[in-house]
Amino acid sequence: MRILVIGSGAREHAIIKALHTDPRVTALYALPGNAGMAEAICLPGDPMDNALVVQQALEERIDFCIVTPDDPLANGLVDALEAAGVACFGPTQAAAQIEASKVFAKELMRKYGIPTAGFAVAHSFDEGMKALQSMPCPVVVKADGLAKGKGVL
C-alpha cells in the first residue's frame, strides 16, 4: 500500500514511524514532511494547495492518505482527495467545522443539549463589549476560527 501523510509535525512524524514498520506499506510519502522523516519520501508543496496535493497523490499512485493538520482539513483537502478517488483518513471539510469554528461548535453543543460553558457571539467590537459586560467573571474570549491551540484572551 502506498501511503501519503500530510503535514510536518510531531504527530505526522509518529504516524510515519509506525507505518514504516508495517509490512503492508510498500511506499511512504510525506507532504511537505521534514528532515527528521527519513522513513518517508518528502514531497515538496503546500498542504493548503488542494489541487497540488491531489496531483502529487495521483502521480505517486497513492492508495491512502492521512490528513491530520487542522488547516488542510478545514480547507477541504480530504474532500478534494476523495473526489479524485484517493481514500483518506481525516474528516471532511464539513466535519472539520467542529474544530475550525468555535461558533459552529458552541451552537452545535447548544442545539443538541451537550453541556458547555455559556457563550455569546459578537460580530463587532461594540457587540463584544456589551456581551462581556453582561457576563459574570471569569470570562474567556476567543475568536472564531483556527488558532492552533492559542487565541484565548
Can you say where each PLM-predicted feature lies in the sequence?
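Conserved beta-strand edge residues that scaffold enzyme active sites
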Residues: 71, 95, 122-123, 146
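Glycine-rich, mobile lid/loop segments that gate access to catalytic sites or pores
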Residues: 129, 135, 151-153
